[in-house]
Amino acid sequence: MANLRKTHPLLKIANDALVDLPTPSNISAWWNFGSLLGLCLISQILTGLFLAMHYTSDISTAFSSVAHICRDVNYGWLIRNLHANGASFFFICLYLHIARGLYYGSYLYMETWNIGVVLFLLVMMTAFVGYVLPWGQMSFWGATVITNLLSAVPYVGNSLVQWIWGGFSVDNATLTRFFAFHFLFPFVVAGATMLHLLFLHETGSNNPVGLNSDADKIPFHPYFSYKDLLGFIIMLTALTMLALFYPNLLGDPDNFTPANPMVTPPHIKPEWYFLFAYAILRSIPNKLGGVLALLSSILVLMVVPILHTSKQRGLTFRPASQLLFWILVADMLVLTWIGGMPVEHPYIIIGQVASVLYFSLFLVLNPLVGWLENKVMNW
């Protein structure tokens, strides 16, 4: 029986990924977020499945069906709160996972990193179409504003928007297809995650010092399986606390009002995890320019490995680059704050400065400082 996991065609795959996987002995808690993201995905698929059993994707009943889930379905309120707040935890883990990759130079595993960026985009798309489903005011107007951005595409823009809407405005056809997409995408994400892991296990994990750790590897189980379990407990406890005590803390009050195409909410803004990208979008006065900046804010991650100039992999022994990293973190927080603010002075100029700094850090300052550090160390 002990060797069945090493010989059985299916168990062998799981064994090589979760049990006998050679893992660097010095990876810190920052390496927990990959498995936490897996847990988030499973949790979201399960809670989402139970919600889909009671939800109706029709504009006349969608809002009522969500109310029905919360009032009449056994533990429906809990499932809904876990699902809505689970999305927030998903993005918290995502941002920390990406930050870890940027800090320790994990992006030099190019295939793993690029699939990771694609995964990030897929999760963002999933969250966006999911936010439309309750059919509240912010759902409707968020869908209208964000889908309208496609009209900035030259020549085919307007046709593209109407094609996505399934008509001349966000309507029943839009809601129905968004529900279909929201059901489908998590499984696409799960598939892409398998690829992400496949490429990661070709090279093995990076580690905090950024050196080859082949000489000092330990089995994943029991060491890191138990370490991950601690992370699971902490995250599930935090999620449960949020869902039970402050379920609406991160939501928008406007979404408790049923969608009304005749009334525009005073401030249209996405969920908190998209605010940084929304701030970058708004900081450019031109529509097409804003859309390109929005896309670039995510796709800039793909050029990070190409612009890596340092002879060292991570930032562990590079104080100047560490400073830039923490400036980037602060800049993201400023952009998140600005994204939730009205478009007026002084928020406009703060957003524009923060957006310029965001791209400068990735495209100019980091490569430059990496090169300078090489010079200082006589490499």
Swiss-Prot record:
UniProt cofactor note: Binds 2 heme b groups non-covalently.
Gene Ontology MF term list: metal ion binding; ubiquinol-cytochrome-c reductase activity
Quaternary context: The cytochrome bc1 complex contains 3 respiratory subunits (MT-CYB, CYC1 and UQCRFS1), 2 core proteins (UQCRC1 and UQCRC2) and probably 6 low-molecular weight proteins.
Names of required cofactors: heme b
Residues bound to heme b b566: 97, 196
Further remark: Heme 1 (or BL or b562) is low-potential and absorbs at about 562 nm, and heme 2 (or BH or b566) is high-potential and absorbs at about 566 nm.
Any GO CC annotation of this UniProt entry: respiratory chain complex III
Name this protein carries in UniProt: Cytochrome b
KW Mitochondrion (keyword) present: yes
Database matches in Pfam families: Cytochrom_B_C (PF00032), Cytochrome_B (PF00033)
Organism from which the protein derives: Anguilla anguilla
Topological category with respect to the lipid bilayer: Multi-pass membrane protein
Principal cellular location given in the protein's record: mitochondrion
Binding positions (a ubiquinone): 201
Cellular compartments annotated: Mitochondrion inner membrane
Listed transmembrane segments: 33-53, 77-98, 113-133, 178-198, 226-246, 288-308, 320-340, 347-367
InterPro entries on file: Cyt_b/b6_C, Cyt_b/b6_C_sf, Cyt_b/b6_N, Cytb/b6-like_sf, Cytochrome_b, Cytochrome_b_C_euk/bac, Cytochrome_b_N_euk/bac, Di-haem_cyt_TM
UniProt-annotated binding residues for heme b b562: 83, 182
GO-annotated biological processes: mitochondrial electron transport, ubiquinol to cytochrome c
Stated role: Component of the ubiquinol-cytochrome c reductase complex (complex III or cytochrome b-c1 complex) that is part of the mitochondrial respiratory chain. The b-c1 complex mediates electron transfer from ubiquinol to cytochrome c. Contributes to the generation of a proton gradient across the mitochondrial membrane that is then used for ATP synthesis.
SUPFAM superfamilies with a match to the protein in the record: a domain/subunit of cytochrome bc1 complex (Ubiquinol-cytochrome c reductase), Transmembrane di-heme cytochromes
Family: Belongs to the cytochrome b family.
Keywords: Electron transport, Heme, Iron, Membrane, Metal-binding, Mitochondrion, Mitochondrion inner membrane, Respiratory chain, Transmembrane, Transmembrane helix, Transport, Ubiquinone
